[in-house]
Every structure is written in structure tokens, then in C-alpha cells.
Amino acid sequence: MKTLVLLSALALLAFQVQADPIQNRDEESKIDEQPGKEDQAVSVSFGDPEGSSLQEECEDLICYCRTRGCKRRERLNGTCRKGHLMYMLWCC
């Protein structure tokens, strides 16, 4: 009888561990589907206070954190984080 209770507890624990990632993915998808939050501009700054050729080249660079692919002529420039979620950084 004790063995049956122990096996049942282990099975329930295994189901709970598998269910937690599914709940986290559901929360992420709810966040992803909110309109207006997907395309938020990100400020890009460089360390040299006097400026550099790289800074001059990227002066008009506009970047967005989003989960989905690029739009127009954007390209992937790295990752960004909003809270505990990681997103892709797309710049044009």
C-alpha cells in the first residue's frame, strides 16, 4: 500500500513538472498576442562620448524587440529581454 502511494505521488510530481513549462508557454503566447507591445523602439548607444565612425553610421538605426521575423529591410542584430522573456532585436 505504501508503495502504491509513493508511486502515485511520483507520477503526480512528474505530471506537474511537465505541466509547468506548458503554462509558461501559454503565458508567453498571451503576452505575444497583445497588440501594440510587439513593436517597441529600443535606444542604441555607444561607449565613446566623442563619437566614432560606427556611431555615425548607426545614428539613424531603429531597433525593435519582437518574437516574430523581420519586417521590411530589417535584420537580426541580437537579443533583448523584457522581464524574464527573451526576444529578438531587429534593426533597420
From Swiss-Prot:
Residues 20-57 form a propeptide. Residues 24-40 have a biased composition (Basic and acidic residues). Residues 24-53 are annotated as: Disordered. It is found in: Secreted. InterPro entries: Alpha-defensin (IPR016327), Alpha-defensin_C (IPR006081), Alpha-defensin_N (IPR002366), Beta/alpha-defensin_C (IPR006080). Belongs to the alpha-defensin family. This is Alpha-defensin 25. It comes from Mus musculus (Mouse). The gene is Defa25.
